[in-house]
Each structure stands twice: as C-alpha cells, then as structure tokens.
Amino acid sequence: MEVERLDYTDFLNEAPGRQEAFVQHLYAALSRVGFAKITNHPIPESVILQLFAWTKGFFTLPLEHKRKAAHPPQPNPHRGWSCIGQEKLSVIAQGKAVLDLKESFDMGPGDDELYPNIWTDEGDLPGFRAFMEDFYGRCQSLHLQLLSAIARSMQLPDSYFAPLCSQNSSELRLNHYPAVSRHDLTTGTMRISSHTDFGTITLLFQDSVGGLEVEDQTRPGHYMPVAADDCTDIIVNVGDCLQRWTNDRLRSANHRVTLPRGLTHGMVDDRYSIAYFGKPSRDVSVRTLSALLRANEEAKYREEMTAWQYNQSRLLQTY
C-alpha cells in the first residue's frame, strides 16, 4: 500500500467534476491510510527551497546562538529550540522513554499573547524570523483550504471547519535529524519514535533522505515507507482532533522516522523536515461533532474537553 499522490490543481479548477474527484480521492486516502501527498499546491517551489535553506541555516548556528531561543524545560510554552533528546515522543507511544535523535524549533502565530514566539537575535540569522512568519501564514491558508476540501468530501459546507479554527493556535516546527550510524538506528534508537499528531491535519515537507514510515491501519504494527520523491510535495496527515470530530471516520495514523529502507551500512545522512501542525482554536471542543454522526451511530468521544486541554494533556508526556 502506498500513500496516494493528489494534484491540487484539480481542487482549484473551476470544473466541478475535477473538484469533486479531488475531494473524494483525498477522503479515500485519509480514511484508508491517514496520509496523502499533495502536489502542484499554492506554495511555490522557490519558497520551499528557501524554507530548507533557512532551516539548515538555523540548525548550523553556534550552540550559544540557538540557546538564546531555547525551549523552556517545561512543556509550555511549546516554543523555541529543543536540543536532542529533550522531547520524548516514545513516552506517548510506548509508555517508556527511548531517545529521539533530533533537534527542533517551534513557533506559533505572531500575535499569540498567551505563548509568544521565542527567537534568537536577528543579527544571528538576519531574515530568518521574517521568512518563517511569512511561511507560517502560507501554511495556515493551505490548512484551511484542505479542511474545506475534507468538509466537502463529507457532504458538509466548505466552510464548516473554518469557525472551529478561527483563533489560530497552529504550530510550525523545523526538525533536524543529525547524521547517525546505521548501527544506532538498528538498536532501538529512533530518529523520532512512533506517534500521532495532536491537531486537525499536519502539512509535512521532507527532504530526500527518507526514513518516514506510517503504520498500516489495517495491520497494526506493520509500517510502510513514505517515499521522499520530491521536497516540494506536501504530505498531509490526519491529527487526533480531526479523528475525534469525525468519530473515527478519519483516523490519525501512527508514524515514525527510522532507518531508510535499503541502507545496509555506513552513516545515515542528516535529515531535515518541516511540519505545520494545524490545530483548532484553543477553546473549541474536541467532542465528536453531531453533524458527522451517521444514522443510529453513537459518539465515541463524549467527554467535554477543549482543544487546548487535549493538547496540554499530550504535551505533558513529551518533556
């Protein structure tokens, strides 16, 4: 089974037949695997290439510069630079800590008064902040467009999910997986351990190194590689909040980053990826939505919990 690759120009096309085909293929991919690939989307190739260049530029800064933007030792605010091993996603998936071999940088919306962003000095990497704030905005626009496609695929108005995400709390994360020996990745150490994402949908940009795998939802415990064909492709995956809203019609899939398949010896190259974690407004409920219940179907997620409360409950396990 492979992750389906969809042409986004079909959704932007004025011909209703092409739009309908796109939304139905998107729903089929997300309901079957939890993942899809989007090509020919609105974010230009030149911007994505700059994105990877800025990401590499940040992670190659001297340690003392990155420490100026250090993530606090506690889970919140989920902002700034995290060193290797600071975040332990394996605690969520397995109930035990296994070192995740990555460093990361997290940011949210520029107008977030509750959790303001944490930046290194402008002089350390001039232009970095301005580029990332612009890129964040591009991702938020695409996030809402894709939610409109998902709404339409489920026979809801295109704008159905928009009010649930009106107070933006989404996060952009830059990831760097340092070069590591093949031996280290065959002895239980993951580049990033198996986990699901917390929010609505995630937009993932990855380089050509590979190693991303997604669990086959029809065969728990079996993982399949997500090919790193083109860094301009966007990998879209379902998050926990969308799973809860849809009463498991769309399910968040476990995924991890490990040894690229086919590599038999030597070193695994540095890997860079960027993830935009689309999220609901913090005060929005993550109970199952009544509009998404089929006839005679009971809601699986009935407890009253806001998106912020759910996000915090997950974050507390990772730091």
From Swiss-Prot:
One of its GO terms (molecular function) is dioxygenase activity. GO terms for biological process: antibiotic biosynthetic process; small molecule biosynthetic process. The keyword DNA-binding does not apply. Keywords: Antibiotic biosynthesis, Dioxygenase, Iron, Metal-binding, Oxidoreductase. Fe cation binds at residues 195, 197, 255. Residues 168-280 form the Fe2OG dioxygenase domain. Belongs to the iron/ascorbate-dependent oxidoreductase family. This is Proline hydroxylase buaE. It comes from Petromyces alliaceus (Aspergillus alliaceus).
